[in-house]
Amino acid sequence: MTTLEIKNLDVSFGEKKILDNLSFTLDSGQIAALLGPSGCGKTTLLRSIAGLIQPDAGTIRFGKQLVSLSSLSLPAHKRKIGYVPQEGALFPHLNIAQNIAFGIDRAAFTKEQIKQVVKEMLMLIDLVGLDMRMPNELSGGQQTRVALARALAVKPAIILLDEPFSALDAQLRAELRTDVIKLLRTQKTTAILVTHDREEALVSSDVVALMRDGKIMQQGSPEQVYSSPTSATTAMSTGD
């Protein structure tokens, strides 16, 4: 079943077109790796899906729900989207429990239910006992885990990860990536992972989408994309 369907998406900033007639689909439970050079529109695509940018044209559909301009301002828990920006972007003035609980719909849950969700998330990311710590008291890897828990706490239909491991050293990056992907698989969460790392895409994803100049140039399994680039542009994007 298709969870995400994007058709003919255009986004411009001033005179500069960032996304150019972009189309993309992702099935339920799949993890997609989004690769491409800096400035090709990867983050803009995620922010458009998350409702943080209003596209100039095109459609974004989650299952049967068409995301319209009027729905873009809805809270993340109502749109069922989890978003982890680069370096996690935790709220520095909130403790870990408050960060995790931030996006939960307080109209739909009691305080005790919210506490239970936070407890479950802390267990899920292996940070039990750190709920009262402040973000600056955590390591980079721990902050990334908390950002992931905050996104998962809203029970998203899809989670968007914008280079979540980029600030970490190679060993920690590999360890945390393994843990995060395992967590997403366990939760059967549909996800898009933005990365510059070809190896990361190969070991983490079911689908690789290569971007250049605001377009998806090629989409397929990691093996298909890396073994059979369809154009010189695609070959450049894969490093071949």
Residue ranges: model-predicted function:
Residues 153-157:
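A short, proline-enriched helix->beta-strand linker immediately N-terminal to the Walker B motif
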Residues 219-220, 228:
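ABC ATPase "signature
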Residues 94-103:
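Short coil-to-helix segment of the ABC ATPase nucleotide-binding domain corresponding to the Q-loop/switch region
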Residues 134-138, 142:
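Conserved ABC ATPase signature
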Residues 65-69, 112-130, 182-185:
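Conserved ABC ATPase "signature" region
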Residues 67-82, 106, 111-116, 229:
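ABC ATPase NBD coupling module
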